[in-house]
Amino acid sequence: MEKFSNIAQLKDSGLKVTGPRLKILDLFETHAEEHLSAEDVYRILLEEGVEIGVATIYRVLTQFEQAGILQRHHFETGKAVYELDKGDHHDHIVCVKCGEVTEFHNPEIEALQDKIAEENGYRIVDHALYMYGVCSDCQAKGKR
């Protein structure tokens, strides 16, 4: 996403355009396929020569989540990770050895969840499915 689009996105979300917000949003655009913790954001920004305090990063991540720019997840690692909210629904498979996260969407799983909810008198308004296993790389390395 281009810088003017990020400025518009911040304004449309009701957030003031600041240097730290733009840098953090740019970072998530650049790492759009990754799930980043606050510590990851801090480390990557430092590597790029950008110094933003950890407290500011946590505050911006929370603001972005509340504004619908980011989604927060809590995988087995115990720490929150964030990804851009692209407006599409997907689920996650997480490697318990290396932490790799794979996103997937399966219509059969979605239909089964709807069926189970209906059978129990529910209408699903939202859900999150996290599956945990050992990725092929870790299996090949014998980390079972």
Swiss-Prot record:
Listed as disulfide-bonded, the cysteine pairs are: none
Say which domain of life the source belongs to: Bacteria
Q: Where in the cell is the protein located?
A: Cytoplasm
Q: What does this protein do?
A: Acts as a global negative controlling element, employing Fe(2+) as a cofactor to bind the operator of the repressed genes. Regulates the expression of the fbp protein.
Would you tell me the protein name for this molecule?
Ferric uptake regulation protein
GO BP annotations of the record are: negative regulation of DNA-templated transcription; negative regulation of siderophore biosynthetic process
Query: What SUPFAM superfamilies does the record point to?
Result: Winged helix' DNA-binding domain
Where is the major localization of this protein? cytoplasm
| Species of the source | Neisseria meningitidis serogroup C
Tell me the protein family, please. Belongs to the Fur family.
Q: Name one GO cellular component term.
A: cytosol
Q: Where is this region: DNA-binding?
A: 1-86
Q: Where is this region: Dimerization?
A: 87-144
The gene name reads fur
Gene3D superfamilies in the record, alphabetically? 3.30.1490.190, Winged helix-like DNA-binding domain superfamily/Winged helix DNA-binding domain
Matching InterPro entries, A to Z? FUR, Fur_C, WH-like_DNA-bd_sf, WH_DNA-bd_sf
- The entry's Fe cation-binding residues are H89, D91, E110, H127
Annotated GO molecular function terms are: DNA-binding transcription factor activity; transcription cis-regulatory region binding; zinc ion binding
Q: Which UniProt keywords apply?
A: Cytoplasm, DNA-binding, Iron, Metal-binding, Repressor, Transcription, Transcription regulation, Zinc
